[in-house]
Amino acid sequence: MSDNTLVSDYGMCEEEQVARIAWFYYHDGLTQSEISERLGLTRLKVSRLLEKGHQSGIIRVQINSRFEGCLEYENALRNHFALQNIRVLPALPDADIGLRLGIGAAHMLMESLRPQQLLAVGFGEATMTTLKRLSGFISAQQIRLVTLSGGVGPYMTGIGQLDAACSVSIMPAPLRASSQEIACTLRNENSVRDVMLTAQAADAAIVGIGAINQKDQASILKSGYITQGEQLMIGRKGAVGDILGYFFDAHGEIIPDIKIHNELIGLKLNSLSTIPTVIGVAGGEQKAEAIIAAMRGNYINALVTDQKTAGKIIQIIEK
C-alpha cells in the first residue's frame, strides 16, 4: 500500500465510503484502481460500493445536454397535459424498453421521495421492473410500500426483490373476484379496507398503462384476469387502455357496464386523485392512445415513456 492511503477500510462507515469514492471517481477523475489504493480497499469493493451508491440514491448522475431526456418532447407534453413531472428516454436501438422504463421511473422516484414516505404500487411489468431498480433506495430511505389492488402473484416479481425488513402492505384479496357479490364482500373486510385507505394516503403512486391494441401482449390478459373474448368485447365498447384493470375510452372516460369493473378489488381510478403524485410508466408506440387517454382522464400527473412513444403522442394530439 502506498503513502496515498488516507484511511483504512475500518475507519469509515459504509455511507462515508460511498461518498468519498463517488467524489474521487466523478469529481477528481480517479480510476477505481487509484481509489482502491488511496482508501485501502480492494478494487472489487470500490466497484461494488459505486453500484450500491447508485441503487441507494446517494449517487445521482446528471447529464447536461440538449439531447438528455428529449427535452423538446418533455416540454411539449408537460405543457399540453399540465404534468407535474415527465421523463422521455432517448431512443436506443435494440435496448430492452421495459428495463429502460423501469430505470427511468426509479430515478424519478429517487428524486421525489423522502425518507419514510409511502409509495403505492400498481401491478404490471413496468412497475415491477421499477421496484427491482429501487430495492436499494427503498431499504436505505426506509420507504414504505402499499399495493393498489388485490392479487399477490402480480406483485411478487418486484416485492420479492426487496429486503425482508421493508414495510409492505399487501391487499389480502385477489385482484378479481369470481362475482360482483364476492368482490363486494371482500372489499368490506376490515383487512382489505385498511389497505385501501392506506393506499389512498400514499405520498406517491406508480402505475402501468395497458393498451387494448396490445392484444395477447397485454399484461392483464397474460396474467389471466381477462379472457380474449372479454378483451374483444371491451375494445368494441370503445376502450383504448386500462389502469389497475379499469378500462377507459380515448377521452379518459371509464367504459360503463363492463363485468370486470364490478369484480375488481382495489382502488378505483377516481380514488387516485387523493395521491399527490401518480406516475404512469408505459412505452411502445402502440400505447400512445392509451397514455393520452390516461392523461386526459387525469388518472396520472407524471409520466415516464420513451422517445418514439412521445413522438407518436405529439403526432396524435397535433392532428
UniProtKB/Swiss-Prot annotation:
Induction: Autorepressed. Residues 32-55 bind DNA. GO terms for biological process: regulation of DNA-templated transcription initiation. SUPFAM superfamilies: NagB/RpiA/CoA transferase-like. One of its GO terms (cellular component) is cytoplasm. It comes from the Bacteria. Inactivated by phosphorylated autoinducer-2 (phospho-AI-2). Phospho-AI-2 acts by binding to LsrR, which is then unable to bind to the promoter regions, allowing the transcription of the target genes. Its main location: cytoplasm. Transcriptional regulator that represses the expression of the lsr operon (lsrACDBFGE) in the absence of the quorum-sensing signaling molecule autoinducer 2 (AI-2). It also represses the expression of the lsrRK operon. Acts by binding to the intergenic region between the lsr operon and lsrR. In the presence of phosphorylated autoinducer-2 (phospho-AI-2), LsrR is inactivated, leading to the transcription of the genes. PANTHER family: TRANSCRIPTIONAL REGULATOR LSRR, TRANSCRIPTIONAL REGULATOR-RELATED. Belongs to the SorC transcriptional regulatory family. This is Transcriptional regulator LsrR. It comes from Salmonella typhimurium (strain LT2 / SGSC1412 / ATCC 700720).
